[in-house]
Amino acid sequence: MQSTIKPVEYDRPVAAGTVCGVGQAWAKVPDAPSAEERAALKARIKALLAREKAVLVAHYYVDAELQELADETGGCVADSLEMARFGRDHDAQTLVVAGVRFMGETAKILSPNKRILMPDLDATCSLDLGCPVGEFSAFCDAHPDRTVVVYANTSAAVKARADWMVTSSIGLEIVADLHARGEKIIWAPDRHLGSYIQKKTGADMLLWQGSCLVHDEFKGIELDLLRAEYPDAKVLVHPESPENVVAQADVVGSTTQLIDAAVKFDAKRFIVATDLGILHKMQLAAPGKTFIAAPTAGNSATCKSCAHCPWMAMNGLANLADVLERGHNEIFVDPAIGERARLPIDRMLEFAAAHKKRVQASGDLQRDQSLFANVGAA
């Protein structure tokens, strides 16, 4: 059973002063600096992080140079929730989030007394854009008998309307547990991840019809052709991808689980169906192996993302240096919303602890080897 709610079009024109659509995001992507400029910017950022007593956390999907900076300065490169948890547990009172807005909000929810900065506050997420809190709340109100489960890729306001928040690495287990208890579910916002979980668990789920711009563009027919070209390659797929892509996967998993799979598999070649930003960490974790991007266009079709999130690409060295220099672009979450939004997050963390499952990994592959035991073939 699926929702009939029409999703918000995330490539629509957006008024000035609000989050930006796809075209506006690509227009705001910083130009690549020269080698000389890059070196100067990195040195400046390191000095500013020290001056501000700040720590940099970066998502796997941002550009490699930002991931390198986070690693080099004692920060963190990870999934969205681990970014927030790292910031919460770190001594620094200023956390700089290189990612998209919901990640900054989640960091603020877990660290309400810390200063959370972002290189560009317009950097958003198509899943967040496609699930406006007003429409979503009305949909939930129309189905009061259902437990509301939302994905991490949502605004603080949507999280505050939920009973549970989940990540891609634990969503399956939580929904299976709810289903075993006879609970009916509203799932938001990603329809592909929701459908994957629904098929695996048999749960009664109403699916909000959102999608990730990047993962929604992966093409099943073209992937099949690419697999024929590289028959020795293992296929790694994020579950936000369409069903005909997920069906061809050797492993379906979260970003960290896919990195772990690249390390643990004996294969020397991998086809990867997630954002290209992850390839930097995969190449570091599994040197000597080859990673091929899954196709996002075919049969004369074009792609809007071409396997790289335009909002993630808005994070650059220059605007990172600027936000540290000026102290602007601070994330604020209404305290009442933040307090309510923390409840579904804490519920997930308590479930993970009770089931001895790590919800997200830290990027430390030695520590996180057990994660891969929870990932099965599609």
Curated annotation (Swiss-Prot):
<dbReference type="InterPro" id="IPR003473">
    <property type="entry name" value="NadA"/>
</dbReference>
<keyword id="KW-0408">Iron</keyword>
<feature type="binding site">
    <location>
        <position position="125"/>
    </location>
    <ligand>
        <name>[4Fe-4S] cluster</name>
    </ligand>
</feature>
<comment type="similarity">
    <text>Belongs to the quinolinate synthase family. Type 1 subfamily.</text>
</comment>
<feature type="binding site">
    <location>
        <position position="168"/>
    </location>
    <ligand>
        <name>iminosuccinate</name>
    </ligand>
</feature>
<keyword id="KW-0808">Transferase</keyword>
<dbReference type="InterPro" id="IPR036094">
    <property type="entry name" value="NadA_sf"/>
</dbReference>
<comment type="pathway">
    <text>Cofactor biosynthesis; NAD(+) biosynthesis; quinolinate from iminoaspartate: step 1/1.</text>
</comment>
<keyword id="KW-0479">Metal-binding</keyword>
<keyword id="KW-0662">Pyridine nucleotide biosynthesis</keyword>
<feature type="binding site">
    <location>
        <begin position="151"/>
        <end position="153"/>
    </location>
    <ligand>
        <name>iminosuccinate</name>
    </ligand>
</feature>
<feature type="binding site">
    <location>
        <begin position="238"/>
        <end position="240"/>
    </location>
    <ligand>
        <name>iminosuccinate</name>
    </ligand>
</feature>
<keyword id="KW-0004">4Fe-4S</keyword>
<protein>
    <recommendedName>
        <fullName>Quinolinate synthase</fullName>
        <ecNumber>2.5.1.72</ecNumber>
    </recommendedName>
</protein>
<dbReference type="Pfam" id="PF02445">
    <property type="entry name" value="NadA"/>
</dbReference>
<feature type="binding site">
    <location>
        <position position="59"/>
    </location>
    <ligand>
        <name>iminosuccinate</name>
    </ligand>
</feature>
<dbReference type="GO" id="GO:0008987">
    <property type="term" value="F:quinolinate synthetase A activity"/>
</dbReference>
<dbReference type="InterPro" id="IPR023513">
    <property type="entry name" value="Quinolinate_synth_A_type1"/>
</dbReference>
<dbReference type="GO" id="GO:0051539">
    <property type="term" value="F:4 iron, 4 sulfur cluster binding"/>
</dbReference>
<dbReference type="GO" id="GO:0046872">
    <property type="term" value="F:metal ion binding"/>
</dbReference>
<feature type="binding site">
    <location>
        <position position="80"/>
    </location>
    <ligand>
        <name>iminosuccinate</name>
    </ligand>
</feature>
<feature type="binding site">
    <location>
        <position position="255"/>
    </location>
    <ligand>
        <name>iminosuccinate</name>
    </ligand>
</feature>
<feature type="binding site">
    <location>
        <position position="309"/>
    </location>
    <ligand>
        <name>[4Fe-4S] cluster</name>
    </ligand>
</feature>
<comment type="function">
    <text>Catalyzes the condensation of iminoaspartate with dihydroxyacetone phosphate to form quinolinate.</text>
</comment>
<keyword id="KW-0963">Cytoplasm</keyword>
<keyword id="KW-0411">Iron-sulfur</keyword>
<dbReference type="GO" id="GO:0034628">
    <property type="term" value="P:'de novo' NAD biosynthetic process from L-aspartate"/>
</dbReference>
<feature type="binding site">
    <location>
        <position position="212"/>
    </location>
    <ligand>
        <name>[4Fe-4S] cluster</name>
    </ligand>
</feature>
<dbReference type="GO" id="GO:0005829">
    <property type="term" value="C:cytosol"/>
</dbReference>
